């Protein structure tokens, strides 16, 4: 027990290190402090002066206890209490130890209402932009600014981070053909969409298109035929993918292959591509009109592309649903 007491006393003296010396015109060296005309050793960070110096004895320093600290050299009579635990919308960004205070910052999804000397004292949840709006910036305090998504953009998430991205949620594919005779047709829905008559078939193959095709029609007037494929409006296109449509118009007779040229390029801001192919020689005139649009902005002009070969056709017969083939 006697040896332990001596050891503790030695450790305390080591913190102080050295004996007081006289101040030079009231000034001490380095970080030493002046007391009663004597210069004494300051305690290092992480400790405090459990006993100040006196004639013949230097400062006695003791380590800070848990949840207390001193960040610099000092001769304070006690360590400073660390800030309380980070709770609520706060999360700990710096832990409390003997040389530094605890620092709290806002947890994810929150912004700072009241800053402290370090970190934040009070945080609040960031505003969440509703569907159809995106994050456009931040206030001076860090809250979210929401702006209605402009033309050809959308955000379908309720979020404090999502921005408006170029997208569409509706695709319509309409075709006009000449000459045709058969007024009856069948369709097949699934991975590919097909309209079929006794003279030809129109097959729509689609890759990486999120809007789902589920409606089709076909009708005739005289020797002209018209049909179409349409998606629902409940799914937006993922803008990291390219929606690709490959439309094959195949005559029952003939095997000559023609690629129909694009005659209208649209606005060119949405992620899509198309290929229109005619196989066989039963048709002299082909028009394919494809529209990509956002149903939440019906007042805006759609992204419209046109493919044409032969005479331009503008037939719009009364839609006729085809008989479904499973």
From Swiss-Prot:
Keyword Signal attached: yes
InterPro entries assigned: Poxvirus_TNF-rcpt-II_C, Poxvirus_TNF_rcpt-II, TNF_chemokine_rcpt-like, TNFR/NGFR_Cys_rich_reg, TNFRSF_N_viral
The entry's keywords: Disulfide bond, Glycoprotein, Receptor, Repeat, Signal, Virulence
Disulfide bond residue pairs: 28-39, 40-53, 43-61, 64-79, 82-96, 86-104, 106-120, 123-146, 129-149, 164-185
Gene3D superfamilies xref list: 2.60.240.20, Tumor Necrosis Factor Receptor, subunit A, domain 2
Source species, domain of life: Viruses
PROSITE patterns in the cross-refs: TNFR_NGFR_1 (PS00652), TNFR_NGFR_2 (PS50050)
Sugar-modified residues: 66, 181, 205, 238
TNFR-Cys repeat windows: 27-62, 63-104, 105-147, 148-186
GO biological process: positive regulation of membrane protein ectodomain proteolysis; regulation of T cell proliferation; symbiont-mediated perturbation of host defense response
Protein name: Tumor necrosis factor soluble receptor
């Amino acid at each position: 027990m006697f040896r332990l007491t001596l050891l503790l006393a030695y450790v305390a003296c080591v913190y102080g290190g050295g004996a007081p010396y006289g101040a030079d015109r009231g000034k001490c060296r380095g970080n030493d402090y002046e007391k009663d005309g004597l210069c004494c050793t300051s305690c290092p960070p992480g400790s405090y002066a459990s006993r100040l110096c006196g004639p013949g004895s230097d400062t006695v320093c003791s380590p800070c206890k848990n949840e207390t600290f001193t960040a610099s050299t000092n001769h304070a009579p006690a360590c400073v209490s660390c800030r309380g635990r980070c709770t609520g919308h706060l999360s700990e960004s710096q832990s409390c130890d003997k040389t530094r205070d605890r620092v709290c910052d806002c947890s994810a999804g929150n912004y700072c209402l009241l800053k402290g000397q370090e970190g934040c004292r009070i945080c609040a949840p960031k505003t969440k932009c509703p569907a159809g709006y995106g994050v456009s910036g931040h206030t001076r305090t860090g809250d979210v600014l929401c702006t209605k998504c402009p033309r050809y953009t959308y955000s379908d998430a309720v979020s404090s981070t999502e921005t408006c991205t170029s997208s569409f949620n509706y695709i319509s594919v309409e075709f006009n053909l000449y000459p045709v005779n058969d007024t009856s047709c069948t369709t097949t829905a699934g991975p590919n969409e097909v309209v079929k008559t006794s003279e030809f078939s129109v097959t729509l193959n689609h890759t990486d298109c999120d809007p789902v095709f589920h409606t089709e029609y076909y009708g005739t007037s005289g020797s002209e035929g018209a049909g179409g494929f349409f998606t629902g409006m409940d799914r937006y296109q993922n803008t990291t993918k390219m929606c690709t449509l490959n439309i094959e118009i195949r005559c029952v007779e003939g095997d000559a292959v023609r690629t129909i040229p694009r005659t209208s390029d649209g606005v060119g801001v949405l992620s899509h591509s198309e290929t229109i192919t005619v196989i066989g020689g039963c048709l002299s005139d082909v028009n394919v009109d494809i529209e990509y649009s956002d149903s939440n902005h019906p007042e805006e002009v759609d992204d419209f592309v046109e493919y044409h070969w032969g005479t331009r056709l503008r037939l719009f017969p009364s839609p006729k649903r085809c008989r479904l083939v499973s």
